[in-house]
Regions:
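Short acidic/polar active-site loop segments enriched in Thr and Asp
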Residues: 104-105, 205, 224
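Generic hydrophobic/aromatic pocket-lining and core-packing "Φ" positions
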Residues: 95, 196, 212-215
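Zn-dependent metallopeptidase/amidohydrolase metal-coordination segment
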Residues: 209-247
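His/Asp/Glu-rich mid-to-C-terminal helical/loop segments that flank catalytic regions of hydrolases
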Residues: 235-270
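Active-site/ligand-binding-proximal alpha/beta "capping" segment
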Residues: 163, 168-205, 263
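Metabolite-binding pocket within alpha/beta catalytic cores that recognizes anionic/polar moieties
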Residues: 1-154
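Polyanion-binding loop/helix "lid" in catalytic or ligand-binding cores
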Residues: 147-158, 186, 196, 252-264
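Non-catalytic positions within long, well-ordered alpha-helices that form the structural scaffold/packing
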Residues: 99-100, 200, 219
Length: 270
């Protein structure tokens, strides 16, 4: 993996991706933050050596380098998932690349279903902790100790100082921002009523199919990490309604302006 990482980093440096401070992963229906940045360079994932290729049709599949609120940022416009047939090492490969390029902070967004019935669709949830239900770990491979501590500490996977800033920004801008536990499952099928009941018993407030692998690797690399979910549907097992993926995307897009406000104002403080 080290050789692949070096090849990818050399390619991106040659394209002008120089010393980004912050990495941002944009999830389902949340790609419009790129309209807020001054783009310096952008490259399709298809053209980046050793990079996975986005197969989800509503993910743009671009790596973008630019300036936002006075900071150099690198943005993944679309991410990878284990349900696309990728390994967890593939899914998290871009995080390792962004770290080698220079980022110190990783910000992540996603669309998720609300298990906590006090949370409503269209609202946002700051992730305070998570449940890794992906069936494995992105650190479970030979040679991982060459890239960082094998037994990565996960006592505080989400940076407390950044989360406190997010909460203060939300309050100042009258944005409802819940805080809770995110469960990451494989997908791509949505959950059954029994699975939602199980997740609630386990302590999950929301469920999705991403984010946790990237956060694990961010911690492995010593990055500060934070993540926010857009709650796109309500997962009440006693009144479960069929959900269409187009509805999820539409709800994420509706909540996107508040997400953009939070990210922009946070980045200004970093």
């Amino acid at each position: 993996m080290i050789k692949f990482i070096e090849e990818t980093v050399d390619y991106l440096k040659g394209k002008g991706f120089e010393s980004p401070e912050i990495g941002i992963i944009l999830g389902t229906g949340l790609g419009q933050l790129v309209n807020e940045i001054t783009i310096i360079k952008e490259v399709s994932y298809n053209h980046i050596p050793n990079f996975p290729t986005a197969t989800v049709e509503f993910h743009k599949g671009k790596l973008i380098y630019g300036e936002l609120e006075g900071k150099k940022v690198i943005i993944m416009q679309g991410r990878f998932h284990i349900y696309e047939g990728y390994s967890l090492q593939d899914v998290t490969y871009p995080v390792r690349i962004m770290e080698k390029l220079g980022i110190k902070t990783l910000l992540v967004s996603n669309a998720s279903g609300a298990i906590n019935l006090d949370y409503k669709k269209g609202e946002l949830m700051l992730i305070d902790d998570h449940l890794n239900l992906q069936g494995s770990s992105p650190l479970a491979f030979k040679g991982v100790e060459l890239l960082g501590e094998r037994f990565a500490d996960m006592s505080l996977p989400y940076d407390v100082a950044i989360n406190n800033k997010f909460k203060a920004i939300a309050k100042a801008n009258n944005i409802k921002l819940h805080e809770g536990v995110y469960a990451s499952v494989v997908g791509p099928q949505l959950e059954t009523r029994a699975e939602y009941r199980m997740l609630k018993i386990l302590g999950a407030d929301a469920v999705g199919m991403s984010t946790v692998p990237e956060i694990i690797v961010a911690n492995h690399l010593g990055l500060k990490a934070a993540a926010i979910s857009v709650l796109t549907d309500e997962c009440d097992p006693n009144n479960l309604q069929p959900v269409d993926i187009s509805e999820i995307i539409a709800m994420a897009a509706k909540a996107e302006p508040e997400m953009i406000t939070l990210f922009k104002k946070l980045i200004k403080t970093l």
